[in-house]
Amino acid sequence: MAITAQLVKQLRERTGAGMMDCKKALTETNGDIDAAVDYLREKGIAKAAKKADRIAAEGTTYVASSGNTAVLLELNSETDFVARNEGFQALVKEMADHILATKPADLDALMASEIETGKTVETKLNEAISTIGEKLTLRRFVLAEKTDADAFGEYLHMGGRIGVLAVVENSTDAEAAKDVAMHIAALNPKFVSREQVSAEELEHEKEILKQQALNEGKPENIVEKMVEGRLRKYLEEICAVDQPFVKNPDQTVAEFLKSKGGSLKSFVRYEVGEGIEKRQDNFADEVMGQMGK
């Protein structure tokens, strides 16, 4: 497979590794970018990629609750200017209220649902597009339920750039739940606890850590212990309950919630535009792209 300049660029963006290292990794893995990420990590050249898609789309996240139901949603616009527009913000709130009231099963059901007499959500959005003059996309939403004995943690960071909805069990301390949601916004864990990490992911990480240790020239007899220690540290980094609590690093999130009589049941974290990349090719990139073909 031809290793194009665009492929090298993508790998550099995902790993932060140098151009020649990326080119070699892609050559060794026959252009498989995921395998190339692993190759670079095994060589100690790149850190674990945390969903390294560039954040590019504009818009906002929004979180709201009513009784024992809460919603987190993302509404995208083309520019940040529109995202701060009062009409846009009112639309976001209206969508959240509608979702809480109707509890649609998915995005398709939401778009087809009636938000006003004779008017669907899709029609409402199209009208807003005509008024505002930009393409708007209701990209995603999630609903969460709790009992009277639980609490929602609702947090918006940077005016909605990041939104978090957490459910804390066996505690009605909404302030503590909000603090945990703020922690999740800041540290971006992947899982609630290590029980949620699949055996496949653990084995994958173990293999990478083993290769790292071997490539560092460590003796075989101590590699296993090194892998165990590094895997434990990796799990502490990706599991919310094991992370040092952002407001008091002397205790973990689990310990903080335990002091309030609760535990973290679930969370969802949205960051505006994650996974969406605007095309931003400049002339130099275009020329490199042509040369690489």
Swiss-Prot record:
UniProt xrefs under InterPro entries: EF-Ts_dimer_sf (IPR036402), Transl_elong_EFTs/EF1B (IPR001816), Transl_elong_EFTs/EF1B_dimer (IPR014039), Transl_elong_Ts_CS (IPR018101), UBA-like_sf (IPR009060)
Signal peptide span: none
Disulphide-bonded residues: none
Keyword Cytoplasm: yes
GO MF terms, alphabetically ordered: translation elongation factor activity
Stored Pfam families: EF_TS (PF00889)
Location(s) in or outside the cell: Cytoplasm
Involved in Mg(2+) ion dislocation from EF-Tu, as annotated region: 79-82
Domain of life, per lineage: Bacteria
GO CC field: cytoplasm
Keyword set, alphabetical order: Cytoplasm, Elongation factor, Protein biosynthesis
NCBIfam families, per database record: tsf
Physiological role: Associates with the EF-Tu.GDP complex and induces the exchange of GDP to GTP. It remains bound to the aminoacyl-tRNA.EF-Tu.GTP complex up to the GTP hydrolysis stage on the ribosome.
Family classification: Belongs to the EF-Ts family.
Protein name stated in the entry: Elongation factor Ts
Organism the protein comes from: Macrococcus caseolyticus (strain JCSC5402) (Macrococcoides caseolyticum)
Protein encoded by which gene: tsf
